[in-house]
Amino acid sequence: MIRFESDYLEGAVPEIMSRLIETNYEQTAGYGVDPYCRAAREKIKLECNAFDADIHFLVGGTQANLTVIAAALRPHQGVMAAETAHIEAHETGAIEATGHKVITLPTTDGKISAADVKAYVLRHRADESFEHIVQPAMVYVSQPTETGTVYSLPELEELSSVCRDLGLILFVDGARLSCALACEGTPSLRDLARLCDVFYIGGTKHGALFGEAVVIKNDAIKKDFRYIIKQHGGMFAKGRLLGLQFDTLFTDGLYYKIGRREVAQAGKLRAAFEAKGIEFAYPSPTNQLFPIPVSY
């Protein structure tokens, strides 16, 4: 039986499994200071054209979101996100449990607009009792979104411009980023590094056993980030297992190949549904498909 409920029902791609087996008995330093993590960082910096970025490897998406937001925000600040966002709907209140409110914005397709962000922040700042309300200080978007939709390059550029004008931090959750990169008109890794304060490159949903690579451009977020990783339970002792996987994913374009295959396979499913007259809840070009059930 073929199952379709998520991106992580199998183990890892053969290239990663082979390297894990080949290097299994090597002895390296722990906690991400090994040669494999260093090599992976350099490959990602090159791919992003971001040689001033700090790169950290974490095990999963919720852990990455929690750690980044904790590092970026002060206690009185919150993060704006779509009402369907992963940090709002699928992380068991992890962000709020550690002291930061998720400020939700309305959405019809999983995306939020620069105009809505700007309007919310300006309303907050115009409120005479603003200091009694959580201060909006970060914008969180995922690429793709929870509905499978994607931000185009112009949309992300507009969000980035508004965030910079208003002094907000822009954070992109890239748990499914390889699929977005395979879609036409979407921001590249170099665009993300240019437009965002921080983002991460998902591995768990794209052929790795586990792992997300956090790319930090904002110097304020870089400060003491490893302390914050450790405090939030994210300092993986056998860190080389993360580095080795990302080193493999960024060898010979493997990360991009995986995303293209995922999107292509989903396209076959989409076409089969459409041939039967079945419609979709959202206009998703990625591998997240939401067919609307029909009765005959």
In which residue ranges do the predicted regions lie?
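Conserved PLP-enzyme active-site core in the AAT-like
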Residues: 2-294
